[in-house]
Amino acid sequence: MEIDYYDYEKLLEKAYQELPENVKHHKSRFEVPGALVTIEGNKTIIENFKDIADALNRDPQHLLKFLLREIATAGTLEGRRVVLQGRFTPYLIANKLKKYIKEYVICPVCGSPDTKIIKRDRFHFLKCEACGAETPIQHL
C-alpha cells in the first residue's frame, strides 16, 4: 500500500503562492519611528507625530484622540507635530504609543500590522489584510 503524500517543500510553496501580495514580500518591515519629544515650558511637543501616524497607517486625528484621552490633556495637531498641554516624559508618550499599537494596529489573531479600522453600523472593527480576521475594537 503506497500513499502519495505531498512533499513539505511543495506544500510550503503552494501556501506561499496563495498569500496576498502585500504580505508576501515583507520581512520585519514594521518599524515605528520613536517619538521625538521636546518640552518647552508647560507644553510637550511630539515633533514627528505625522511620521508615526503614517508608519502605523492610521489617521493622525485618531491617534491624537487616543493619546489625549490616555494622558488626560488637551492638544492640537500643527502640521507634522502635536502640541500637548502639560509636561510629559518621552517614556510616558512611548508607552501610550505602544498601547495604541497593541489595541488599534496589530492583529490579535495573526500578529500582522497590516490592518485597517472599519465601521459597520455603530461598531468599529480592526480588519486584518493578511488573515482576514475582523476583531471588534473600542470606539474613540
Curated annotation (Swiss-Prot):
Q: Which InterPro entries match?
A: IF2/IF5, TIF2_bsu_arc, Transl_init_fac_IF2/IF5_dom, Transl_init_fac_IF2/IF5_N, Transl_init_fac_IF2/IF5_Zn-bd
Q: Which Gene3D superfamilies does the record associate with it?
A: 3.30.30.170
- Key words, A-Z: Initiation factor, Protein biosynthesis
Instruction: Work out whether the entry's keyword set contains Coiled coil.
Output: no
- Keyword Signal attached: no
Gene Ontology MF annotations: translation initiation factor activity
Known SMART domains for this protein?
eIF2B_5
Assembly, per entry: Heterotrimer composed of an alpha, a beta and a gamma chain.
Family statement: Belongs to the eIF-2-beta/eIF-5 family.
Q: What NCBIfam families does the record point to?
A: aIF-2beta, PRK03988.1
Q: Which HAMAP family match?
A: eIF_2_beta (MF_00232)
Give the protein's function.
Answer: eIF-2 functions in the early steps of protein synthesis by forming a ternary complex with GTP and initiator tRNA.
Official protein name in the record:
Translation initiation factor 2 subunit beta
Which species? Pyrococcus furiosus (strain ATCC 43587 / DSM 3638 / JCM 8422 / Vc1)
